Amino acid sequence: MKALVKEKAEPGLWLMDVPEPEIGPGDVLIKVLRTGICGTDLHIRSWDGWAQQAVRTPLVLGHEFVGEVVETGRDVVDIKAGDRVSGEGHLVCGKCRNCQAGRRHLCRATVGLGVGRDGAFAEYVALPAANVWVHRVPVDLDVAAIFDPFGNAVHTALSFPLVGEDVLITGAGPIGLMAAAVARHAGARNVMITDVSEERLELARKIGVSLALNVADTTIADGQRALGLREGFDIGLEMSGRPEAMRDMIANMTHGGRIAMLGLPSQEFPVDWARIVTSMITIKGIYGREMFETWYAMSVLLEGGLDLAPVITGRYGYRDYEAAFADAASGRGGKVILDWTL
């Protein structure tokens, strides 16, 4: 089968012929239809410091996908050939304290699809049945391909009650944009999103945010005033991983404000802990998706009319992967999709 492979410990990817994956008794073999390109894939392609520490070559990349089941192991009883499916990209041990308590997203031994084991940038991918999400109602293929990052957005945005709240989102990348759509759909009063990319801020305006603010020339405090806020934001969703974004968010929260932090900083950085303490601000780290409550929430949101179409801005056949990755790395658009049927 064809697959995008990190063949060598150096920058680049290689489209290669590799053996089709074999499945065990509890596994599912899936014919991949479409995949989404994630920031993680960009890191592995560029072979930065994180990738050099996390990845062992050769490796098939990719963890965002939608496909069709073609074969199931003998112990799989609730998934059948022909099912349209996506996959939870975090494979957990099932034995630790958190796994046994049903908190699988907190497993200390998590292995990432397309990072710690061969992934979905291929014509076929194999997964444990416990990681397979069957789409019981029709979902657009492009949207189904990005259920993994959509889940990150949903997990972050729904960490705290949103109805009637004023929400600040720092970072208008694809996950930030999806979080903004979720916040609006879930009943937030105001949703302000910040970035330095006018192209991405324009996407945010199409989603329907209250204010899309370019922090290269306007402060968050100015945005507050434009929205008529007197005491700061109730909810903060930090999606950028930028130190200055987190510091500005803390400075613009109301007393008792709550922050969900998905953005992953590249290094340690100082924050105003005195402000956090005296303003009684709650900060919650977010990683991945709750299994499978977040997946249920995603399906319900889409059934309820949530529109993610503006977030998907690039579509390519898998053989045009170089152009697709360049598009995804440009920082100017939303999600980029690879079609494995072309």
UniProtKB/Swiss-Prot annotation:
Pathway: Amino-acid degradation; L-threonine degradation via oxydo-reductase pathway; glycine from L-threonine: step 1/2. The active site is at 40 (charge relay system), 43 (charge relay system). Its cofactor is Zn(2+). GO terms for biological process: L-threonine catabolic process to glycine. It catalyses: L-threonine + NAD(+) = (2S)-2-amino-3-oxobutanoate + NADH + H(+). Its EC number is 1.1.1.103. GO terms for molecular function: L-threonine 3-dehydrogenase activity; zinc ion binding. Binds 2 Zn(2+) ions per subunit. Pfam families: ADH_N, ADH_zinc_N. The record marks 148 as: Important for catalytic activity for the proton relay mechanism but does not participate directly in the coordination of zinc atom. Zn(2+) 2 binds at residues 93, 96, 99, 107. It is found in: Cytoplasm. Zn(2+) 1 binds at residues 38, 63-64. Keywords: Cytoplasm, Metal-binding, NAD, Oxidoreductase, Zinc. Its main location: cytoplasm. NAD(+) binds at residues 175, 195, 200, 262-264, 286-287. Homotetramer. Catalyzes the NAD(+)-dependent oxidation of L-threonine to 2-amino-3-ketobutyrate. Belongs to the zinc-containing alcohol dehydrogenase family. This is L-threonine 3-dehydrogenase. It comes from Streptomyces avermitilis (strain ATCC 31267 / DSM 46492 / JCM 5070 / NBRC 14893 / NCIMB 12804 / NRRL 8165 / MA-4680). The gene is tdh.
